Amino acid sequence: MIKLIQISNINKSFNKRCVLKNISFDIEQGKCIALIGKNGAGKSTLIDILIGNVNANSGEIFDKDKLLQSENRSIMFQKTMFPDQLKVIEIINLYQSFYENPLPLEEIIELTKFDSSQLNQFVNKLSGGQQRLLDFVLSLIGQPQLILLDEPTSTMDIEIREYFWSIIENLKEDNRTILYTSHYIEEVERMSDKIILIENGEIILNDSTSHIRTNQQSQITLSD
């Protein structure tokens, strides 16, 4: 198993409030890793540290192949924000222009499952779930090897969510590496290869999904 990225003893505080404490784990090639925990557990802060938006107070990130650099990874943030004045197809074309070797337009449209009417309407006319799906597909346009997703299925209905996970399955078969945050236990148990549970800024569980399924002592529960 190839370790692409090693996170070692990451600590972060805001205004003397500890948000992350001694966070350590590995990101392995071709694996789908779930960071789970209640709102405020520190998941999004950790993603921000990984992509360089926030500096850790201490700790190290070993990324020898520079996969965390913007040209080698993609990021889907927790909140989708599109400019209201652009149509769906215009946003797709804009994102294609960012990359030397983007996904072909036909493949992008196939991934969105949008018809001609949806492609030519203003993006704010899409449902919340459709906007999340579009945001996800946009994160794939540059054909990244590392995909970071922060609460990707929020606002998706059951149908869109099922379709989203079918795309994740295809990405896993293509040996893409995925790190995502979630608080949907049923999703992470179904799709992830490894689950990392963060509680009050600390990792309290870091184990393979298969072992968690079969080990009663590792059963996961989240409460608000």
Model region roles, listed by residue range:
Residues 147-151:
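Catalytic Walker B motif of ABC-type/P-loop ATPase nucleotide-binding domains
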Residues 36-38:
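The feature captures the beta-strand-to-loop junction immediately N-terminal to the Walker
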Residues 188-190:
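A short, surface-exposed alpha-helical micro-motif characterized by mixed small hydrophobic
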Residues 80-134:
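ABC-family P-loop ATPase nucleotide-binding domains
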Residues 58-71:
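Conserved ABC transporter NBD signature motif
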